[in-house]
Amino acid sequence: MKTDQPPNSTGPLPKLRNLHPNIWAATATSFLTDISSEMIVYLIPLFLANVLGVRTAIIGLIDGIAETTASLLKIYSGVLSDKLGNRKWLAVLGYGLSTIAKPFLYFANSWGWVLGVRFGDRAGKGIRTAPRDALVAASTGEETRGLAFGLHRAGDTAGAFLGIGIAALIIWMTQTNDSLLSVATFRTAVLVSIVPAVLAVIVLAVGAKEVTVAGKKSSVMRLSLKNMDNRFKSFLFVIVLFTLGNSSDSFIVLRAQERGLSVLQTMFMLMTFTAIYTVLSGPLGALSDKVGRRRLIIGGWLAYGLVYLGFAFSATGWHIWALFGLYGVYYAATEGTAKALVADLVPDTQRGTAYGLFNAAIGLSALPASVIAGALWQGIGGWNGFGASAPFFFGALMALLACVMFWRWVR
């Protein structure tokens, strides 16, 4: 199999033209995948609540189980990619599985059916994420790593923006009353989402190449923190702490509807978020190469805490809309930067495993995070919870604690 080494970056500033073709292939794949995914992912909680009448605790459970499924597979796909030295085809397999699962949402008539499809979709994400991130990391030098991950994230969010825009167009064309989501609108969005999903698999399979990694491949599929840098271990702990307060964005969508935004207005709100996220992802990723990952992550988490406080105190849907735009700053500052920090903290030969552990820490924390948020909002069983503001107060508190721990422990 032909292999390529990442080209060396020249000059004091990172240049887009020096990035390895794998970065562009991964970016294009994520762009197409997010067109597909974002067309339907934010409609799912509205479908569950508006059409099936599901309570927020169950919605949180569905999102949590889906993310936990992904997290468990992220662990072993990362370890397996280190063992085989093969990043590309594991990633292709994961994208393919998600593409196969999504069309079955068309037939969903219960929350259990939705859970099953989400399970398959996120299983695909779990398989692909760690080897894809390891491929990106291996295809760039340290001096441009933040830029590479920022560019990849920008492609991801650009696709999300377009996907949500297509969803908004479908809503406008298929619903005369958009205060609640209709079954016909949801099914139309599912059908249209299949096309970019298939194209994404083709782009990665054809456009990416394996990159040789210096050092000996792992001969055993072993998941262990034993030989990892202590700073990486501390970072994982802090990530878990933060994620426990970072419940599914489904709750923000439901909060927007609860505060009076229509389905179409909610899509425009999401487009505002993704536009800000897309514009800032690349520059903030490159900024982390200059000022340091640590400062940017802390700044992003502080922004998250302030935005979540705003969600808690919001009185109208327009407040949610404005705050969700600022939420894009948090995402842009932290998503790519955190992944670049992982690459900084471990050697090349451990990166697949490290990304598996990193993504698993987030995913395993997502289940309790979303269940806690749903329970705080509407309760479980005979308990009615504390109301719609409660999960956002909790998220703001956890973000503050994570900032303090990160500042003290990860240097």
Predicted regions and their residues:
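Helix-loop boundary and gating motifs at the non-cytosolic
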Residues: 12-71, 232-269
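Structural signature of the two symmetry-related core transmembrane helices
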Residues: 89-104, 194, 295-310
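Cytoplasmic helix-loop-helix junction between adjacent transmembrane helices
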Residues: 117-158, 341
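C-terminal membrane-cytosol helix-exit motif in multi-pass small-molecule transporters
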Residues: 172, 194-215, 402-410
